[in-house]
Amino acid sequence: MRNWRLNFVLVIIILFGAAIICRLVYLQIIQAGYYGAMAKGQQKLFQPLQGLRGNIFFKDNRILAADINEKYLFVCPDDVEDKKYTAEKLSEITGLEEKLIAKKLEKESMFERLKDDLTEEESQSLEDLNLPGVYVKDGVSRKYLQGSVASQVVGFLGGESAGQYGIEGFYDDILRGKITFFERGDNSAEKESKGGDIYLTLDYNIQFVAEKLLEKAGSELGVESGQIIVMDPNSGKIAVLANFPNFEPNNYAKVKDFQVFQNGAVQKLFEPGSIMKPLTIASAINEGKISPNTSYVDAGKLKIGGYTIYNYDNRIWGKKTMTEVLEKSINTGAVFAESQLGSELFMEYLNNFGFFSPTGIGLQGEIYSENKELKKGYEINYATASFGQGIAITPIQMIRAFSIFANGGKMANPYIVEKIVGGPVSNVSRSDAGGESERIQGVGPEISAKEIISPKTASQVAAMLVSVVEDGYAKAARIPGYYLAGKTGTAQIPWSAIGVNKEGYSDETWQSFIGFGPAFNPKFIIFIKLDNPETKTAEYSAVPIFRELAKYIIDYWQIPPDYE
């Protein structure tokens, strides 16, 4: 009886063992391919890749910003055995201050990054040194290959790999590479995870020249800051968006005044002064209230309520036409045109010119003013706004509004991104998008469908602006063989704009010039704004800069002359 039970147990054990062996054979031999592939797939899920950030290009495909492969140095302080010796040696090789390195080595940390973008010599020396806790690794860093050129436009990559300011900030989600999970050896993974590439409308050569002209104004005219914008008035394409002073985005951490990061063309308000006069007069002409030949008698000053408005230098001009008002930049003449138009229509035109709304150019931090003081309905506010005081706008708003004279009465919306390739939005441009809801803000051309002034009015005012260059205060803008149209502007800067808690205006000035050419077949429109130059008026500061830049563009683009 006992033997039977023992045999039964042995049989059960043998059968159980045989079942296990059969199962192992099935899994390891018959189903080996299936489970191998399954394991391989599971491994693939746990191999992440941070995609490279997209590149930023100039119009000519010149790289403005890109992720560059590099070697970098880091230390693990807990693993460093002789901290004094290590600090000395690392300082000798890298050129970093020994005190800075020693401070990093004293931290209770597993990772302290010391230096990026190591040279081959530095990298090899560090590896040969082979110090405990000192490591050289491969990495990627964001580089701005054109240095400070267009720095406020491009912005920079800040902490936590987040885009700051400009294109880097506004299009951060598009530029940022995505994290993907890939199978080792899959070469397509890196391409698929890369962020979108952004192609700008900026022309590197003209941008470079414009920035040099601003630097020259800084050194020779004492200009504190300034901007130059060049735009195609037919499309709104921005060829130049230059700022002074600029900064080196590769070393942005060294900048002490954070205001330098701001793009003054879209982030700083100013009062335009006399460059507003053509818009005021155009509004009245468009409504049939006046014509270019309408005359009035200037007495040198004008009383409105308890206020008195004077001409520049208290000049008395006598009888003048509206064309002469622009030539001589007569304040009371602009007030006369506004009075003929009426305050309600005047405000309607200011709104149509886009002075109470942003342009949507697609740069981080664009601002605008609602001009609440102007909207209070006081007659004196309308009067001063007619010649550009008491109304606050940005340079980009100004060039957008002025484009109506060079574009048959229609307003060109400025844009600076031509197209986006790859990334979360593939191959996007405004020109091939099906509608407003499908496009990305600021990408590609878009002409306002709304006619702001009639083509006839636009042509009339353009001719008046040619007279300003030929016979007025902008003679220094003339270029032989070409008809150019433009207007000077000099406006007092409010105390509040220079950080003084005080009402009224200082003796400091904004000096500007806006012009286009050739006047009757425009290819470019240029806006120049200078903050507090040492010259008395824009005639001696902004106008010569316009001429030099316009001459460069005419030669560079090979624009044929109007006459021999």
Segment roles from a protein language model:
Residues 1-34:
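Hydrophobic alpha-helical transmembrane signal-anchor segments
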Residues 24, 32, 60-62, 69, ...:
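Solvent-exposed coil/turn segments that connect beta secondary-structure elements
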Residues 30-48, 62, 66-85, 104, ...:
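Short pre-catalytic segments that frame enzyme active sites
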Residues 43-45, 71-79, 87-90, 108-116, ...:
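Second-shell loop/turn segments in exported
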Residues 65, 228, 232-274, 279-425, ...:
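Beta-lactam-recognizing serine transpeptidase/beta-lactamase-like catalytic domain environment
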Residues 85-92, 104-195, 504, 528:
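Small/polar-residue-rich segments within soluble enzyme cores
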Residues 442, 544-564:
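Short, gly/Ser/Thr-rich active-site loops of penicillin-recognizing serine hydrolases
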